[in-house]
């Protein structure tokens, strides 16, 4: 991709900046501790830059909006042919709007929904998450119009606009308004109603909302995006310069201050134009080693932050931010949904060479106000297990059958076990393949979740 604003500053200005402001990059290499700190402080921004760019700019992404200020709207349920996103699910369908707020505010009109769970989540490059609307707060019973803007939106500073129900300030010029809708696929009539409502979501600029043409958007070249490792070992500092120029930082926030300090050390500061001659030349092999270490730690620690992830600015700790950025950007905070990894009774990894059963009595069911689901993935790519039945999860949305006592037995098996309802069977292909079983609890009773014991998958003995 064409480099962003290369060699912009003329030599005399560069000299002035070097002498007058001390902004030249340090000549020495970063210590291991300094490099690790830089990677940790940057991870959330790299992850969200890749995520948002993938939504808005990558036409091959199955969730692509094909540009900014547009919306991806699903037309049906997801199946195992979707491989571009890890951890897919049909519990909630994704309605993704990508926002460019530089020139003017953007208005999104949301219809009412006939659903137990609908949650609107917003995030910008900093990966702090807000929930402006949710059925957990009584929203989506009637149509709602939300106006989005940032601190740099031209000609607008948050004043009321006739016809707008809520004004919401984003923490950056580029962001996403991510709607999750439980489709209630087990009820054809309700499912059809919710799919119709999804198609009614409307995105327009404030000018368009007021009956005028949209203001022309200034052209902008985005640095290369891809996987997190690709960015860290590629155009890392160019991406970070772009990101900090389009992000609102709070001088009173400790994480913001620490991130800016780490970036300043390598020549990246808000308001500057990227100049490869004035940033630290990082050793890619050292960066790769550091990123792998940070990512591995984040993945290993994910379950430690079930109640501390995907929160607004000021409510996040660095380790929780890294864990959420590594495992899956723009997830739900604990008051909306909690994701639990299901282990085995013998402590061994689940494998498709064997069958398993997960048992829960009525009193052992997850404490969900809305609903819960158990979804099966392969353990390597975290994708659906292909099967002719297109059965990937058990729960109210995908189908479940409780026993007479109100409990449930969920079987993971290559063949449907005798006497087991099809609703409670998760098919696998008999081979040496790691499995991943994930429980999602929507609108959880959080205090009960803190003491609730997750079930274990028990290996079924061969007859």
Region spans (language model):
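Bacterial N-terminal signal peptides that target proteins for export
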Residues: 1-12
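Residues at the start of alpha-helices and the adjacent loop-to-helix junctions
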Residues: 3, 19, 31-34
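Bacterial N-terminal signal peptides
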Residues: 11-20
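A compositional/structural signature for long, glycine/proline-rich flexible linkers
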Residues: 26-463
